[in-house]
Amino acid sequence: DINPLGIDIGSRGIPMFELDMNRVFPGDNNGAVAESVAAGIVSDIIGSDFCLDIHSSNIFVREMPQVRLNDDNVDKLLPYAKMLNADFVWIFSSITVLDATLAYSLNHLGVPTLVAEMGVGNRINKEYSLQLLDGIFYLMIQLGIWEDEPVKVREPIISTEGEVNFLTAKESGIFVPAINSCGIIHMGDNIGDIIEPIEGRILQHIESPMDGIVFTLRENPVVYKGALLARVHGGRK
């Protein structure tokens, strides 16, 4: 464990330094504690054949097992992303990528690195974990790291940023989902409602704007105006 104090308090920051560990890469050997740790991590990983940075989501939304990469590295990384048994691969603009993350720093330094994201923050989803584990072993077999009979991995949906619709709260209130999990949805299907908690009035009725797949869904019921409720990848509008 590279951050035992953070594990104790459920944070990826080092206590007392107020620094997010995934915002200080590639680090600085002469910097603050978090920066020095980050520099040590990068030094250990440099020279590796491949790196997979595994995340849960935050505590507010649930994510379908997915792999994320920016469009600068598509040619090099997309073949790896397809091996990881994810449901979804999201290719987004490099303009939106933070250059102080582990994945950005390692890719910049020549180590092929992908980010896998799934589930909800501070929670372990066994089904999602086993799904990704199959993908990791499949990738290692393809890279010659592991010898075994490869399992069959699923073919992920490949999406670019322009194909993703963000559904946000227009009012503050309590979000009550109408669907239990991420998955296939049709245009006009009910995703959920925002309820006024005192009177029980429906403040906002949220429907899918397209046929497609919900790959992000609000988990925390308390929402404020502008909060993310769902992300939908789709075709027909």
Protein language model features and the residues they cover:
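Structured catalytic-domain cores with a bias toward divalent-metal coordination
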Residues: 1-237
